[in-house]
Every structure is written in structure tokens, then in C-alpha cells.
Amino acid sequence: MSDAGEVTRSNEVSRLNRIVVLLTLALTTGLLADSGDTPLIDAVKRGDHNAVRTQLRGKIDVNAPGVDGTTALHWAVRADDAELVTMLLRAGANPKSANRYGLAPITLAAMNGSAKVIDLLVSAGVDANTSTTEGEPVIMTAARTGAVDAMKALIARGANVNAREKWFGETAVMWAASENHADAIRVLAEAGADLNARSTQLDAPVLEFPRSGGPNSPLPRGGWTALMFAARDGAIDAARALADLGANLNATALPQTDVPLKPEEISAAQAKNIGTSALVYAIINVHYDLASMLLDKGADPNVVDGAGMGALYAAVDMNSLQWVQGRPAPILTDKLDGSDLVKRLLAKGANPNARLTGKPLKRHHDAGSTMNFGEGTTPLIRAARTNDVAVMNTLLEGGADPFLTLPDRTTSLMIAAGQGYGGIRGEGIRIVVPTPESSIEAMTMLLDRGLDVDAFNNAGNTAMHAAVARGDAVVKFLASRGASLNLKNKAGFTPLDVALGKGGGRGGRGGGVVRESTAALLKQLMEQSGTKTGAP
């Protein structure tokens, strides 16, 4: 190294030494704590009461903040140290100061559930209705924590139990319900909280899947009651408390629309209970025990949403969940499963023949799986789609009419044979995957009740057309039950044509795929019966 380099290095070392000396002096003279905070804040963080007293005897700024605006009082409250809080308040600490995140000490006290510290702060002049800069009232913070004593302290000091946060217009009772804090709900109710208040965020944008073109219409985010939050989150204790306290069990969230609703439309929808109920929210989130409890408390199983979907259809749908898009299926942790709930719903008066009036609301986990299901779909038709034989049997015994069809005259038999089936993916709750065996079992159940094996829909397709994609065993079974082998659909194609890949398309009727084995079977069956194949 050159002499110039040595001199430069020596100067750098000398400068660094001077910085170290200055920092040491700052620390020893109390100008700066080793954490970057003031010595007072550092002492409070350590919980060192003697050091705090020493600092307070000096001429210091008790409200001097750290780099993020957090003061010594914030840290004392966070530590739930009432003695330190008292010392700092007596020394002139500002009880209303907020850090750069908009948090005042009283919000931290509510997070801790500290009634004593809340009393100290309110006695020092803090408003019990303080909110964060994000608009979260402190009573809501305490409700989310479930801190009953803290809530009582705030209420005693004038906290508004019906205050709303600014993002979604939710209230304390909604947050308590979502977190399953039943005791907190009781405290709020006793203080006059509106158990049927609704959140005010009402927009429900409709999304589109570019590949399929199928609509994915999320559940409406607004107009929710506390019971709906409890139902969604499986908060059964909170839901039971709300029911016992008189919450409306049949209130519905606002129906889904492509455009924002006008005020008069909102009022009309709420008056008619057109929308998703807490019972349905519980079911589509796989909280079957909670749903059963709501039924016992008097929930109406026949309340339907804007698509005509009620609790029974939802339970049938969830029992054999279809296309799981991009995420695992829900995990069943309840004592009851979907088939159990179907029985309970029927016993409680659910209409087994209730039809959808439109496309069912998409729930992100089944996007596209029921695109061809909409107006006219019954719970039985939905169960037939996945050959959920146990549920089909329960529905039929409960009064389901197997002769009801979709508007295009597609029968439950065609659906059971594979008409329009889109497949199932994912793992989680019990998933019924249609197989040739399950199709045969489902079709046997329907044919034994008198369905026409050769019934055709508006496109001219029969169960045999649909069976081609389900497998040889299904084709052979239908033939054994007398199904015609060479009926042409409106496009002029027979089941054999479909097996040969003609007239293929979406809907489980060939898709352009050549099924050589099935084609050979159909030719054999037609030859045995003396039917002309019409094939080359």
C-alpha cells in the first residue's frame, strides 16, 4: 500500500474513533438510548421502574417520541404496566398522542383488554370513543379482543356500542361475532347494541373468467349482520348467543347484482329477505353443526338468495363439492356432514323441489363447475350430477320429484348419466367423484321410479348420448334397461356418432374424442338387436 493509502486509512480510523466516542458520550449522558429511542422509552421498554423515576426527575420531554412516533406512554400501556402508566401521566405524558400508525395508547389498552389502564387514560382526558386514523373505534378493538372488562370500562365511560369503522361500516358486535366472543356480545347487547345492524359496504363486482367466459360472481360483501359473520366463521358460541338474544335468524345479505343497487332497491330486497341468509353462509363454509343449531333456534330453511338457492340446495351442493379452483377444498371438522344436514333440513320443512331461479352464486371454489346449471335446477338434479346416491335417496324419500327437468327438458336421468359433467378436482371435504358404477346406481334409482330411459331434451340428446363419455358399463346398463341405441339428436347424431367423435363439444357428450371401445360396444349391441348402425 502507498503512503497516501496509509494516510487515508489512518484518517478513516481516526474519524470512526471520534464517532464511537461521541456515541458513547451520548449514551452515558442520556442523550440517546442504544435502541435509537430516548432513555425514558428504553427504560419503559425494559420495565425498569427505578430508571423511569430517575429519568422523570430530570429535565426531559416525557412526550418525546421514538422514530415511529411511539412515546413512552405507548410502551407502558402496551406492557399493561398500570404503575408506569400512572407515573408517566403524573409527569405530564399526553394520553391522546398517536404514533405514525394512528394508534393512541387507549387502543393498545383495548388490545390488551386492560380495564384498569383504560380507566387511567379516560380519567386523564381520553375520549372513550377514540378511533384510529383508519377509523376503528376503540370499543371495536376491545370487542375483537373479547375483553369484557375493558368493554365494560369503555361503556361506563360513554363508548358508543353502535359505532362503525370506516372501511366496511361494521360494528363492535360484528367483530365480536366473527371472533366467537359470546360474552362480549352479551355485554354489547345489554348496553344497547343493535344486533341486527348491517355493514354498509354494498358493492359486489362481477368478475369474468377469460378462458371459459363463465361468470364468477362473488358473494355480496355488504349488508351483513353479526349473525352472518358468526355463521361464515363457524363461531357457534357467538351465533348461539345472538340467537338467544333475539337476533333475526332469517335476515339476508343484499342480493348480487351487476350494478349498484339504488336505496329503494336495497330496502325492498331487505324487506323481502332476498339474499344469502346466515344459515346458507354457515353451510357453504362447511359449518354444518352451526347450521343445525340455527335450525333448532328457528331459522327458516326455505329462505333463498337472488338465484333461488336456499339451504337445501347449498347442503346438497357442498356435500359433493365440484371444481375446486386454485385452492384446497374446505376441511370438514364438524360432527355433522352434508348428508346429515340434508336430512335435518328436510325434517325442518325444507322444500325438496325448490328450483334455482338463476345462476347460483359462485364461491370462488367452484368457479365454472355449474355454468350450465341455473333456472329450474332442483336439489335432486344437483345431486344426480355427481351421482351422490345417498343424498339422492334422502331427497327422494323426502318428497323430491324425479320427473322435474331443467328448462331445456334435460332430466335427472340424463344428468346422472353424465350430461354436462365438468369434473371434480381437489381434496378436503368428502368429494363424490362419478364413476360408471355410481352412475349405474343413480340411474337405477331413477329408472325404478319410472323415468323414461329414452326421454330427450330440446337438443334431442338422451341419456344414452350422455353415457358415451361415462364409459362402456353405463352404455351397456342403459341398453339392458331398454334404451334406444340409434336415436338422433337435433344435430342428427346418434350415440354411436358421438362415440366416433362427431358433433363433439363441451357438456360431456364426446367433446370430439373418439372412444373406440364404446363405439365397438354400440355396434355390437346394435347388431345383436338387429338395429342398423349407420356407420361405415
Description of each model-found segment:
Residues 67-68, 100-101, 133-134, 167-168, ...:
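Ankyrin repeat start-site detector
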Residues 34-75:
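N-terminal segments that cap or nucleate solenoid repeat domains
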Residues 42-46, 75-81, 108-114, 141-147, ...:
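Ankyrin repeat A-helix N-terminal signature
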Residues 20-30:
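Bacterial N-terminal signal peptides
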